[in-house]
From Swiss-Prot:
PROSITE patterns: PGM_PMM. Mg(2+) binds at S102, D243, D245, D247. Coiled coil: none annotated. It catalyses: alpha-D-glucosamine 1-phosphate = D-glucosamine 6-phosphate. Keywords: Isomerase, Magnesium, Metal-binding, Phosphoprotein. This is Phosphoglucosamine mutase. It comes from Bartonella henselae (strain ATCC 49882 / DSM 28221 / CCUG 30454 / Houston 1). The gene is glmM.
Length: 459
């Protein structure tokens, strides 16, 4: 059943436009606080945020809601999303909240929720929260004597830095490595350069001066141009690109070539398998991961399990099936030996440690397989149910049959935008082009019909 407010990664939208308004954020805080207060003892919530201007507004609104429900709010300030998950466990909180829209522009924002174990909340709990939001919450708020309070937590970012460093053996240092790190003017602008420097690297930090509106703007994991330029300029061994909330990472090698999440997963999986650390003889990725990764892993005797798009689904599959490596091509890398969610800094450290151990350039280390050609198209839509229409479903089935087993067609609705995402993948480029173009035309046509029918109904 589709959820009313929650998408694939929490509640998200444009700041000061529903649902990212202060009054709705306060209601979310009340509903979540009431639910968790009734189930747990500590009544403690930790709240982090990235560097968006609207983070202050939403933070205060959430604090009002949580304290009205009787929760104690511990405010972390700007920290990466994985730091919230880690500190939720470390501070013995009932709940963790991250105010962020990840890789989106500054004018968007979102609310991500974590349970006391550091994992994102299940669909079932999110549904309960939605039901509470739509009720009269005033009758369930705390009494005057039980109203909660808020306090700033000092030194939390240094706890996260130490946590990230401890994912490497004590004898691993990054001496003699020249590293450029693009902080995306986001939540990791302090932690990432500091951790790399403390491990011995020569660090060049760029896009590390957030001003509230420059997060993810022509920088970070969604725009590698400035990172590639800096890597070339200072002759760096590697460039690291984080996103706005620090939960995803892409790399750039010494030749300024992009290394995506699939290649990072391949490196970690192969290295850990050789060292006996890889669990369940495989990894978990999504339907968007490249077929080349699957072929590479299979050639090593390893499995690849695919899930829906979203790191929460990757994590769910990892927990259920016992895998300890998972992720997405976009750069969400989940290593469950260390954490409960994607962590860009920790993933980058594992690659750097591998590079130091093997003593080969990044360009040799991180090109583990030849990617199969992929074509991506986004179709803006008005009717989010257009994929459920029989003519569209039939066309997709027929196109999939035409492509056969050596190619893939993935068509899905975005969980955060009014967009249908189409991905065609296979060795025959001309056929892929034709099939993807056909799908764009069919979806656009039936979405237009939906709009025409809606106009007739209104008239």
């Amino acid at each position: 059943m589709p959820q009313k407010y929650f998408g694939t990664d929490g509640i998200r939208g444009k700041a000061n436009v529903f649902p990212m308004t202060p009054d709705f954020a306060m209601k979310v805080g009340m509903a979540v606080g009431i639910l968790f207060r009734s189930q747990n003892q500590s009544r403690r919530v930790v709240i982090g945020k990235d560097t968006r201007l609207s983070g202050y507004m939403l933070e205060n609104a959430l604090v009002s809601g949580f304290t009205a429900a009787g929760m104690e709010a511990f405010l972390l300030g700007p920290v990466p999303t994985p730091a919230v998950a880690m500190l939720c466990r470390s501070l013995r909180a009932d709940l963790g909240v991250m105010i962020s829209a990840s890789h989106n522009p500054f004018y968007d924002n979102g609310i991500k929720l974590f349970g006391p174990d550091g994992f994102k909340l299940s669909d079932e709990i999110e549904e309960k929260i939605e039901q509470l939001i739509d009720t009269d919450l005033s009758k369930s708020l705390a009494s005057c004597a039980e109203i909660g309070y808020a306090k700033r937590v000092e030194g939390d970012i240094y706890r996260y830095i130490e946590y990230a460093k401890r994912t490497l053996p004590r004898d691993v240092r990054l001496d003699n490595l020249r590293i450029v790190v693009d902080c995306a003017n986001g939540a990791a602008y302090k932690a990432a350069p500091r951790a790399l420097w403390e491990l011995g690297a020569e660090v060049f930090a760029i896009n590390d001066t957030p001003n509230g509106t420059n997060i993810n703007h022509k920088c970070g994991s969604t725009d590698l141009a400035s990172l590639k330029q800096k890597v070339h300029e200072v002759r760096a061994d590697v460039g690291i690109a984080l996103d706005g909330d620090g939960d995803r990472v892409l790399l750039v090698d010494e030749k300024a070539q992009t290394v995506d999440g699939d290649q990072l997963i391949a490196v970690i999986a192969e290295h850990w398998h050789k060292n006996g650390r890889l669990q369940s003889k495989g990894v978990v990725t999504t339907i968007m991961s490249n077929l080349g990764l699957e072929r590479f892993l299979n050639s090593k005797g390893l499995d690849l399990v695919r899930t829906k798009v979203g790191d929460r689904y990757v994590v769910d599959a990892m927990r259920k099936k016992g895998y300890n490596v998972g992720g997405e091509a976009s750069g969400h890398i989940v290593l469950s030996d260390f954490g409960t969610t994607g962590d860009g800094l920790v993933a980058a450290l594992q690659i750097l440690a591998c590079m130091q151990e093997i003593q080969i350039p990044m360009s040799h280390l991180c090109q583990r397989f030849e990617p199969v050609p992929q074509i991506f198209k986004n179709v803006m839509i008005k009717n989010k149910n257009v994929l459920k229409k029989n003519p569209v479903k039939t066309a997709i089935e027929q196109a999939t049959q035409r492509l056969g087993k050596k190619a893939r067609l993935v068509i899905r609705a975005s969980g955060t935008e009014p967009v249908i995402r189409i991905m065609g993948e296979g060795d025959e480029r001309e056929m892929l082009d034709a099939v993807v173009t056909e799908m764009v035309d069919i979806i656009t046509h039936h979405d237009t019909l939906s709009k025409a029918c809606a106009s007739l109904e209104r008239s």
